[in-house]
Amino acid sequence: VTDSRDLNDLNAHLLVDPSWVEKHRRNPDIILLDARAKGYAAGHIPGAHWIDVKALKDNTSHTFAAVDALRAVLEKCGVSSGATIVVYDEGNSVLATRLFYVLEYYGLRDQVKLLNGGFAAWTAVGKEVSAEVPDAEEGTLALFAEPLLVVTKEDIQAGLKDSLLLDTRSALEYAGADLRSNRKGGHLPGAIHKEWKEALGAADTDGVVRFKDALTLKREFADAGINPAKTIVPYCQSNQRGAHTYFVLRLIGYPDIRPYEGSWEEWGNDEDTEVTRL
């Protein structure tokens, strides 16, 4: 039996299933965004618009793409300021959670939901698929950056008060054994390691991967020493996996999560950064 007190600070409204999407997708105030890297043209949830998640990042400056460009893309998809946005990807939710985080960073907090299990969950239950690009009445959207939802390299170097650095990469990246394409290997000094994909359950018989239930996630993050009283700073290589953990922490009610947007792409290639290797 679940103690209802355990559920009070969970944000269950952020996660939806295919039946919820089916019920609400024709509502003009609900906008579906397909964040998959490929496959949209072959078939997608009817009414969904494709978003290029790579375009959400300005790689040269290790930060978000310009707000005006994002606003134009979203308005073309029919997003207006009061809309509810439902995001999905193929199923592991790395791309969908990246989109979720960027939308929340730009002021749409609590207006974005994520389809648990993504497109795989939708097709597994035999829901309708469309190859049509939907028409959309252009939206009118106000976006404002929320500085308390991100940290910079300089913030970390200055010493963030009451913070906890959370490395969401693989164990080999954390240890410094896998450098990928970076000049330095290792992790931010003092960072705790908890890999992003530990938040996902095993694939079901249809191959659908969903998030573990919220109470399990809450317990596992607590057991890993991720204290909700602190400012949690997830990071990875480019803040896709870090954004996945941002979403999970939002789901289970952590109040102060500020990903390091530059992540290892910046930290692992700058001259003036300290690293810890195992």
Language-model features: locations:
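Short active-site oxyanion
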Residues: 28-31, 109-111, 162, 231, ...
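C-terminal soluble interaction/assembly domains
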Residues: 229-234, 252, 257, 269-272
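Positively charged, proline/Ser/Thr-rich regional signature most characteristic
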Residues: 6-82, 155-228, 269, 275-278
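Thiolate-centered catalytic microenvironments shared by cysteine-dependent enzyme domains
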Residues: 2-12, 61, 65-157, 177-178, ...
